[in-house]
């Protein structure tokens, strides 16, 4: 069964793990029936780290950035103009700029699981992270 590996910046990973961010906004979306599983790849950031044990909060140790830190179920996808989407935690002006007058896909985030130990990309048959998202085979 196909799943998705999605690249997300550390600041958004923290908000997803805390339950504050329940919508992921993207320009595209997978052609999969919902619900489907999404694996969260926490992108590398030289200044911030999301992954710090059970606290799941920023720290100055960035060794675990660049790994798959958890998963969620996308149970609904909706198209939306680039206007206010409060559950995305993205400011309206940033959404408008990102949308550039086009529709955006709202991926609804549910059933978030953060791993006790982050996983490597090679566990998903990948040697480098996706620019945005990519299909992967489910385990």
Region spans (language model):
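Structured alpha/beta reader/binder surfaces that contact nucleic acids or chromatin modification marks
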Residues: 1-139
């Amino acid at each position: 069964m196909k799943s998705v590996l999605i690249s997300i910046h550390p600041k958004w990973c923290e908000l997803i793990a805390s339950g504050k961010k329940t919508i992921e906004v993207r320009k595209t979306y997978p052609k999969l029936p919902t619900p489907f599983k999404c694996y969260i790849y926490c992108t590398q950031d030289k200044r911030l780290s999301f992954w710090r044990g059970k606290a799941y909060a920023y720290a100055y140790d960035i060794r675990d950035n660049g790994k798959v830190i958890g998963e969620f179920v996308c149970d609904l996808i909706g198209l939306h103009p680039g206007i206010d989407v409060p559950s995305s935690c993205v400011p309206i002006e940033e959404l408008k700029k990102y949308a550039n007058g086009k529709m955006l896909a709202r991926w609804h985030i549910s059933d978030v699981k953060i791993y006790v130990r982050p996983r490597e990309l090679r566990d998903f048959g990948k040697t480098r992270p996706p620019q945005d998202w990519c299909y992967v085979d489910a385990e």
